């Protein structure tokens, strides 16, 4: 997921900025 939000089990939603 690029420039989006990923939710992992037992984790809070975090934003990914792979597309710098």
From Swiss-Prot:
Q: Which ranges form a coiled coil?
A: none
Which residues does UniProt assign to the signal peptide?
Answer: none
Give the catalytic activity: Hydrolysis of proteins, with broad specificity for peptide bonds. Native collagen is cleaved about 75% of the length of the molecule from the N-terminus. Low activity on small molecule substrates of both trypsin and chymotrypsin
Q: What class of enzyme is it?
A: hydrolase
Q: For this protein, what is the EC number?
A: 3.4.21.32
Location of the region described as Disordered in the Swiss-Prot/TrEMBL record: 1-20
Q: Name one GO molecular function term.
A: serine-type peptidase activity
The processes (GO biological process) annotated in the record are: collagen catabolic process; proteolysis
Q: Which domain of life is it from?
A: Eukaryota
Sorted UniProt keywords: Collagen degradation, Hydrolase, Protease, Serine protease
Positions of the Peptidase S1 domain: 1-20
Q: Where are the transmembrane segments?
A: none
| Function of the molecule | This enzyme is a serine protease capable of degrading the native triple helix of collagen.
Membership in a protein family: Belongs to the peptidase S1 family.
- Specify the protein name: Collagenolytic protease 36 kDa
Source species, please?
Chionoecetes opilio (Atlantic snow crab)
